[in-house]
From Swiss-Prot:
Biological process, per Gene Ontology: ribosomal small subunit assembly; rRNA processing
Species assigned in the record: Schizosaccharomyces pombe (strain 972 / ATCC 24843)
Name of this chain's protein: Ribosomal RNA-processing protein 7
InterPro entries in the record: RRP7, RRP7_C
Upper lineage: Eukaryota, Fungi, Dikarya, Ascomycota, Taphrinomycotina
GO-annotated cellular components: CURI complex; cytosol; nucleolus; nucleus; UTP-C complex
């Protein structure tokens, strides 16, 4: 610590674990920064996050715009950081505030430590039920919208022969009562196109059968996937 003071570092005492323990961080201006907006921090607590660091420096009068290296996960003991502030004057202000013997900051952690930290990390591997429900609802809305568009397309094709003379058979709800002449014409058409309709009924049955098989396969796949996820949740911390 004396060597750090000799090199121009200022000691800042912070409270850890609800003011039960003091921890020392050492600060110094980065003289190699031509903009004179950077600070060196030595011995940063291992559970420090970007949010915690920004809040602490702001209490000393500085506004952090960049942290190097990026903070991600648990830090190593005695971690060194370089932070860049908005204005050069803020560097002077932070060092001045930290150098006062009466200055001590509460270092409020936003996450648990020890076993609780690993439990939280494990739980984050799984999708939040609310987020999952919203995702499913959104997906079902898209499917419903697509089905409606498909029904409209099929309805537009109803009784319209294609290039080969085939007519797409589309099942609909209640049909309006037609005139006797229309009924007679429909009977004549049925006599002429009975074979075609039987052929299309067969196609529709096969298509429906295939769709049901696909749904069954997807159901089995999803069931196996859910089982795998349940097995993975057998968390053993020791």
């Amino acid at each position: 610590m004396d060597k750090l003071k000799e090199k121009g570092f200022v000691k800042l005492e912070i409270y850890l674990e609800n003011k039960k323990r003091l921890h020392s961080i050492f600060l110094k201006e980065d003289t190699e920064d031509v903009e004179k907006k950077s600070l060196y921090l030595i011995n940063v607590p291992i559970t420090t996050t970007e949010k915690i660091l920004k809040r602490a420096i702001s209490q000393l009068g500085g506004r952090i715009v960049n942290i190097y290296p990026n903070i991600s996960g648990l830090l190593k003991s005695g971690t060194h950081l370089r932070v860049k502030l908005v204005e050069p004057a803020e560097v002077k202000q932070v060092i001045k505030a930290a150098s006062k013997k009466t200055t001590s900051l509460p270092w409020k952690f936003t996450q648990h430590t020890g076993l609780k930290r690993y439990v939280e990390s494990y739980d984050r591997q799984f999708v939040n039920p609310r987020v999952l429900a919203e995702s499913v609802d959104s997906y079902m809305k898209r499917v419903t919208k697509k089905e409606i568009a498909e029904k409209r397309r099929l309805f537009a094709m109803k009784n319209q022969p294609d290039e080969d003379g085939f007519v797409t058979v589309v099942r609909s709800g209640r049909a309006p009562v037609g005139r006797p002449q229309d009924a007679e014409r429909q009977l004549e058409k049925k006599k002429d196109t009975g074979i075609h309709k039987d052929f299309y009924r067969f196609q529709l049955r096969e298509k429906k059968k295939k769709a049901l098989l696909d749904l069954a396969h997807k159901f089995e796949f999803d069931k196996q996937r859910i089982q795998q996820l349940k097995e993975k949740r057998q968390f053993k911390p020791y």
